[in-house]
C-alpha cells in the first residue's frame, strides 16, 4: 500500500473561465470531505491494510489567486496529513505559477508537508522550495535520463553526444557521488 493517498480533485484548465473554476473547486472540496470520511471509516476496520496511510488534499483554482487562497483556507480546516498544490504547469507561465505559490502556500499549514504536483525542473524545484514546497513529482528526471541528459555545475549535457564516445572523465570533475566516482562519460555514452 502507498504511504500517501491523494484525494480526488478536478484540475481545471489554467485558462478556464472563473465560473467554471469556482464550480470545479467546490466539487474538489466536496470530494475531499468524502475522501476523508471514507478513509476514517476504513481505518476503523480491523482488516484495513495500511492504517497509517496519509491523506493529502489538493489545492486547485487555476490562475485565480483569490480562489486558490480561499480553497487553501477551506482545505486547511480539514486538518489533513498534508497538502498539495495542483493544477499548475498546465499552461500558465513560470512567473504566474510562482505568483500563485507566493499567494497560496502561506495559507496551507506550515507544520504539514506541502507537495507541488507535476513540477520538477531544477529551476522550478529551487523556486518551489524557496516558497515553502517540500516535495515534487515530475516525469522530467526519467525523461531526461532516457535521453542521456544530466545536470552538472556547468549546466545540462547530453551524454549520448558523439563527443563523449572516448571521454574518460567523470560526469562532474570533483564530484564524489557514486555515478561520478564509478562511471566515465564514455562508458555512459556507449551504454546508450
Predicted regions and their residues:
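Glycine-rich phosphate/ribose-binding loops and adjacent secondary-structure elements
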Residues: 38, 42-44, 50-171
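Cys/His-coordinated zinc-binding microdomains
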Residues: 181
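Residues immediately within or flanking Cys/His clusters that coordinate Zn2+
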Residues: 174
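Non-catalytic, usually N-terminal nucleic-acid engagement modules in DNA/RNA processing proteins
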Residues: 1-48, 162-165
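Residue-level detector of conserved catalytic or cofactor/ligand-binding positions
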Residues: 186-192
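Active-site-proximal helix/loop capping residues that flank conserved catalytic or ligand/cofactor
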Residues: 26, 73, 185-186
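Short cysteine-rich clusters marking metal-coordination/redox-active sites
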Residues: 177
